[in-house]
Structure formats: C-alpha cells, structure tokens
Amino acid sequence: MGELQFKWLFWRSFAESGGTFQTVLIFLFIPYSLTVDYRATPVLSDTTFVWVWNVPTEACVENVTEPIDLSFFSLIGSPRKTAIGQPVTLFYVDRLGNYPHIDAQQTEHHGGIPQKGDLTTHLVKAKEDVERYIPTDKLGLAIIDWEEWRPTWMRNWTPKDIYRNKSIELVQAADPAINITEATVRAKAQFEGAAKEFMEGTLKLGKHIRPKHLWGFYLFPDCYNNKFQVDNYDGQCPDVEKKRNDDLDWLWKESTGLYPSVYLKKDLKSSRKATLYVRYRVLESIRVSKVSDESNPVPIFVYIRLVFTDHVSEYLLEDDLVNTIGEIVAQGTSGIIIWDAMSLAQRSAGCPILRQYMKTTLNPYIVNVTLAAKMCSQTLCKEKGMCSRKTESSDAYLHLDPSSFSINVTEAGKYEVLGKPEVKDLEYFSEHFKCSCFSKMTCEETSDMRSIQDVNVCMGDNVCIKATLGPNSAFHLLPGKGLLLMTTLAHILHHLPHDIFVFPWKMLVSTP
C-alpha cells in the first residue's frame, strides 16, 4: 500500500507574523492578577485536550478485519443501555432514578411534572442505577441527559409548555378562586423549585457515591443562539438567555463538568453562521464555568456529531470540522465528546464508510489541532496553561501551518507528522493567542518565542512533533540609540504609578 499524504489547507488566515524586529520592544509587566485568565486543569496528565468517543460502534471495532481507529480517543464508551463500567456514562431518562416527565404521547411518568415527583424515591432508585452503570469509581464522565423539561420556566416553550400548563392547573386545583396571573406566578415558583431539587439532588448524589467522575447535565449551558434566519446573524447569545443562565448559578456551582452541544443542521454546512453559532455557545460555556470560582473553572466537554442532525447520512466536511472542532479547541476547552446513534454504524456499509471518513478526514484533523494546541501550550504557556484566543471575534485557529508540516498515513496505517516548526509558527501563537492558566496555577507567557530551543509534543500512538529550532538572533542595543531609548523609557516610567510594576521590564532590540 502506498503512502497517503495530507496537505492541509490552513483554513482561515495564518498570519505571517515572523520577520526581524525593526523597533524596540518594551515589555512592561503589569500586576499578574489584573490579566490572569483560567481554564480547568487537564483531567488526564499530559493531555491538554481530551477526545471522547461516545458512539455505539462496537460492530466496527470487534471481530472485523479493518476496525475503525480510535487510538486518539482517551475515553471511549457506548451509550447503549446494556453498557456498564465505562469511562463515559450517559444517563438517559429511563436509566437514572424516577425522573418525572411527560412523554410524546402525553403519558405522565413519576408524577409528570417535578412538583408531583417523589424526590426521596427518585434518589433511592438513582443510587442503585449509578452503582449499576458505574460499579467502580475512577476518573470518568457522568452525563445526565434529561431533555423533557428545562429548569427555567420561560424556556419551556412549545411543545414543552405542557409543563407550564400542568403546573398552573396544579395551583388552580389547590385554590380554585385564584386568578390566572397569580396562579402563573405561584406555578412558576413551584415548578422551578422542584426542578432545582431534582437536578441539584441528583448531582449531589452522584458526586457523593462516585466523586472521581465529572457530573453534569447534557445541553447545559445553552444560550439559544439558533435564530439563523434573522438578518445579519452574528451568533451572539441573547442577553436574556445569559441572564437566565446567571439565575442557574446553583446548577453551575454543583456541576463538576459542563456538557454543551454544537450539533449542526445541514443549512449550516460550510457556513459562516456555523462558525458564529459554535463560537458564542462555547464562549458562554466558558463564562458559566467560572461562576463558582473564577480561578478554578469547571471542565467543559463539548458534544459534536460527525453528521448533520437532519441529514444523518452526510458527514461533516473539512470546513465543518473547522467550524466545530477548530472553534472549540481555539477557545481553550477541556475536550470534545463525539456522539451519535446506533445508525451511524448500522447504515448500509456503515462501518467501512465511517472507517474511511475517520482515516482521511477526521483523524488527520484531530492530529492537526491537538498537536498545534499542545505545541502552543508548551512554547507559549510553558505547559502551565492552555492557549485561547486573545480576541473573541478572531478567526485564528490552532492549526499546523501546511508550509511547515504534512500529515501522513504510513503503510502500517499509522499517522506521522513530517516537518518542524519555524519561528514564524511560534510567533503566530503569541500574536493571536494568550495563555489561560490551569486552575490555581501561576503561568507566565514566553515573552520572546525566538528563545524556544526545543519542541517535543506527542499524542495517541506516538504521533509526535520533535524538533530543535535553529540558533536565535542576537539581541542588542543599536550603537548610538541606547541613550535615546533609556531616556524614552525613563519618561514613560516617570508618568506611571510607582507601584504598577511587580516584574522586571526587558528591552529587546535586534539589527535589521
């Protein structure tokens, strides 16, 4: 078999930020506490970004001649009801306690609405279910998928407005003389209070009996920025939805993992709207992750699908992967969970098609962004933080520059990266990205990327970039200009508050 080579387009711009400095660079270090930004510490050692596979593809892995390659996924679990003891566990409505809800046929289960549910009985049953699906406590993800109702009253719009209507009816049954306005106010308070008790109580139970797992609810947080039909769609989360997320502070404080979703419909195929949609959903998740403790954010794992939700036979294109995976990685989250239903592997020729897609499209891009993110963390953040965009609206991505690297598949089916980073690659990181320090850690950005001598980053089955960079340019003050520079700097310092500096400043100049 011949060697298959990928020459990756560097989607969006890769700024050529290299070149010899023509001017003096004066680094004035302001107090650290004014500029620090945090992200959750990696949940796995030496793994800046975690890939999670949550697809029932056992048929594509076991007892097949050419299995799909899952070597880049650190956590693998099937969402099948029969699967237990996995590092990623997804609890649907029928797998965790006695979740009160109303099904599509309007049949009420366990009381139907939260106010009529039995919390004590629910928690007893939930404990049994957790112990069944997670028999031993070791590092893993525990995601509760309760989508029948939302804990925020106003978010239960059609068809979920049945929960509001039933709640109002409950109040009216207890007090027939009450007017509709007062009944609605009372119903809202009762519904939201009971919803909080069920969700908060379930999280506390899970954390108590399986504390090493990261507990949270699927689709939380959400910001409902999906009105794609409006003119000049900008992806921004509506202020009212951000305020509603603020009102769910009890949920964010109790969660040890956040699990938002950025699934795409086909209308967003290769679309700028998809970029903006994903961007601001992830940014809202980052904001929410800091509610409990800004210096110790909650880990964020973003759910994606490899197909369009309304056209499940069509896989995402490379541009779509950039709009989802690329956006998520560039903003500095903990990882990505790839989910899909059984049909992904059961469709006609499902496994061979999935295997080919992963081999030629998905896995090479995973290699691309993961190694770029690790290289940025190592060189810019000294491995004490992860890289995130300096500017929220930026289209900068953590990609390997195709003029420096190529990603190959060897005859043995293994991936390898050819090439080595150049100074311009590292300076691209420092120009467009900042260091978000890992929780409770002090990190300092590399001030001069030309000082980097070695790069050594790996992922998966020994897929690495190992390189020694060339000698640095010598920096010195140009003859005859030293006095002018010192005079200018002294003038600047004289007009600044005396206590602003806590670190030494550096003055670097190079010859043209």
UniProtKB/Swiss-Prot annotation:
GO terms (BP aspect): carbohydrate metabolic process; cell adhesion; fusion of sperm to egg plasma membrane involved in single fertilization; hyaluronan catabolic process; single fertilization
Keyword Nucleotide-binding: no
GO molecular function, one term: hyalurononglucosaminidase activity
Cellular localisation: Cell membrane
Glycosylation sites: 63, 165, 179, 368, 408
Active site (record annotation): 147 (proton donor)
Keyword Lipoprotein appears in the UniProt entry: yes
InterPro entries xref list: Aldolase_TIM, Glycoside_hydrolase_SF, Hyaluronidase, Hyaluronidase_PH20/Hyal5
GO CC field: acrosomal vesicle; external side of plasma membrane; membrane raft; plasma membrane
Assigned EC number: 3.2.1.35
Secretion signal, residue range per the UniProt entry: 1-35
Keywords, ordered alphabetically: Cell adhesion, Cell membrane, Disulfide bond, Glycoprotein, Glycosidase, GPI-anchor, Hydrolase, Lipoprotein, Membrane, Signal
Xref: Pfam families: Glyco_hydro_56
Disulfide bonds: 60-351, 223-237, 376-387, 381-435, 437-464
Biological role: Involved in sperm-egg adhesion. Upon fertilization sperm must first penetrate a layer of cumulus cells that surrounds the egg before reaching the zona pellucida. The cumulus cells are embedded in a matrix containing hyaluronic acid which is formed prior to ovulation. This protein aids in penetrating the layer of cumulus cells by digesting hyaluronic acid.
Xref: PANTHER family: HYALURONIDASE (PTHR11769), HYALURONIDASE PH-20 (PTHR11769:SF17)
Protein name: Hyaluronidase PH-20
Organism: Rattus norvegicus
Upper classification of the organism: Eukaryota, Metazoa, Chordata, Craniata, Vertebrata
Gene that produces this protein: Spam1
